[in-house]
Regions:
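Positively charged, polar, low-complexity stretches
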Residues: 1-128
Length: 128
């Protein structure tokens, strides 16, 4: 039987809040389902609350609200945080991504998350 995890998009006000919302959707109050992009990808691969047969969907309600909250402004904020700890070898790339986000261009946090879901759980994402 397909399990449906619901993300209430109006509650997603930034990336940190997304981690809380997805954790609760999958694993209940105070649940964990990643606290960074790599951990989120790992959780989607199984063993962290999703069914072993991988028969689940993620229904992201009010996705347009989340898309705005996780847009270029939030992306720039996250990239500034990343820039503070990025290895020198990756600094120029992150600075370029930050410049794009500050100009309102390029991939957003919302894009990062949906791309990870599509990659790790193909066909599981339902944007509403």
């Amino acid at each position: 039987m397909t399990v449906t995890y619901v993300i209430p998009g109006a509650e997603v006000t930034g990336l940190e809040r997304f981690w809380e919302v997805i954790g609760e959707a999958v694993n209940g109050p105070d649940g964990y389902f990643g606290r960074n992009l790599d951990a989120f990808a790992d959780c989607l691969s199984g063993g962290y609350g999703t069914p072993d047969d991988r028969d689940f969907v993620i229904e992201w309600r009010e996705a347009a609200l989340s898309r705005r909250a996780l847009g270029h402004e939030e992306t720039a904020r996250q990239l500034r945080l990343r820039l503070a700890r990025v290895p020198e070898v990756n600094r120029a790339r992150v600075e370029g991504e930050l410049a794009e986000a500050e100009a309102g261009r390029g991939r957003t946090v919302f894009d990062w998350l949906t791309e990870i879901i599509d990659e790790r759980a193909p066909g599981a994402l339902r944007l509403r």
